[in-house]
UniProtKB/Swiss-Prot annotation:
Functional description taken from the UniProt entry: Necessary for efficient RNA polymerase transcription elongation past template-encoded arresting sites. The arresting sites in DNA have the property of trapping a certain fraction of elongating RNA polymerases that pass through, resulting in locked ternary complexes. Cleavage of the nascent transcript by cleavage factors such as GreA or GreB allows the resumption of elongation from the new 3'terminus. GreA releases sequences of 2 to 3 nucleotides.
NCBIfam families linked: greA (TIGR01462), PRK00226.1-2 (NF001261), PRK00226.1-4 (NF001263), PRK00226.1-5 (NF001264)
Name by which UniProt lists this protein: Transcription elongation factor GreA
Pfam family, one: GreA_GreB
Domain of life: Bacteria
Lineage: Bacteria, Pseudomonadati, Pseudomonadota, Alphaproteobacteria, Hyphomicrobiales
Family: Belongs to the GreA/GreB family.
Source organism of the structure: Bartonella tribocorum (strain CIP 105476 / IBS 506)
Any one GO MF annotation of this record: DNA binding
The entry's keywords: DNA-binding, Transcription, Transcription regulation
PANTHER family: TRANSCRIPTION ELONGATION FACTOR GREA
GO BP terms in the entry: DNA-templated transcription elongation; regulation of DNA-templated transcription elongation
Name of the gene encoding the protein in the UniProt record: greA
Amino acid sequence: MEKVPMTTAGFESLKEELRWRQQQERPRIIEAISEARAHGDLSENAEYHAAKEAQSHNEGRINELEDYIARAEVIDVSRLSGDKIKFGATIKLLDEDTEEKKVYQIVGDQEADVKIGKISISSPIARALIGKQEGDVIEVNAPGGAHNYEIIKVQYI
């Protein structure tokens, strides 16, 4: 079983989602199925079919979450240090083309959300950053073309 790197916060978030799906969403869906079943003929009962589809989706996600949690290699980022960029690092970058500053944290695939500055360890920008340090310049080939970034700051917070 291949381990999946994950921050402590990401691991806790997955556990919370699993708890919610098992303890709140599952009973709610079961109740919706029961109510829809009470309406009679199931072959043309849209509420019943929608509830069954929601149940299938929920159970699939529960299985997925259980798998990720079982394979998680939880890394406490606050205990990491060093000058070189590795999993968990928070990096401040300067886009050399636009002069725009960006801040990213390198996290596991399941916790990545670029809108809040969390990039996947397997993303092109993270792969380009790993092993680099403050002052280095990286080139990232993105769908919109190549970008050059200067690494301004590396932290483990």
